[in-house]
Amino acid sequence: MSKHSLIENLKKQIEPIAEGLDYELYHIEFVKEGKENYLRIYIDSENGVSLEGCEKVSRAVSELLDDIDPIQESYYLEVSSPGIDRVLYTDKHLQKYKGYNIVLNLYSPIDKKKKYEGELVDFNENEINIKVEENIVTIPREKISKTTLKGEL
C-alpha cells in the first residue's frame, strides 16, 4: 500500500473516532526521522486541545491500529494539536482562516522573494490572494511549498 493510500485509509477510520471524542481530525502524516517512523495525528476543536484530549484520542486510535495493523514497520504514535503556527493543508483550513495573517513559502522566488506574509483575503483552486501592507498579492498555488498560519497571541 502506498503512503498516500495508507493515510487516506487511516483518515477514514480515525475521523469518526476523533469526532466521537469532540475533536476534528486536522491532519495525519507518516514520516521517517532518522531511524524512527512516526504516525502523527493532529486534532483540533473550537475549544482548543488539552493533554487529556490527546491522551483519549491516542488510546482510542491505538486500539484501532492494534486491530487493523495497517503499518508493517515499527513506529511511534503521536497525537497533538496542530499548534499556533499550524500548516494549512486544505481548502477547509484556508476557509477557516480567511482574514488571518498567513505565511506563504515558495518553491522559487517571485519578485525576488521566496516568502510572503500577509492577511489571507481569498483563494481558489489556482491561487491564493493575500494583503501585504495595502496591496493584494496573488500567488499561484503551484508555486507555494507551504502555507502556515502566522501565530499571534
UniProtKB/Swiss-Prot annotation:
For whether the record's keyword set contains Calcium, the answer is no
Q: Which UniProt keywords apply?
A: Cytoplasm, Ribosome biogenesis
Q: Which gene encodes it?
A: rimP
Give the protein name, as stated in the record: Ribosome maturation factor RimP
* InterPro entries, per database record: Ribosome_maturation_RimP, RimP_C, RimP_C_sf, RimP_N, RimP_N_sf
Question: Which residue pairs form cystines in this protein?
Answer: none
Location in or out of the cell: Cytoplasm
**Biological function:** Required for maturation of 30S ribosomal subunits.
Q: Name one GO cellular component term.
A: cytosol
Question: What organism does this protein naturally occur in?
Answer: Clostridium botulinum (strain Okra / Type B1)
Family, according to the entry, reads as follows: Belongs to the RimP family.
Superkingdom of the source?
Bacteria
Its GO biological process annotations read:
ribosomal small subunit assembly; translation
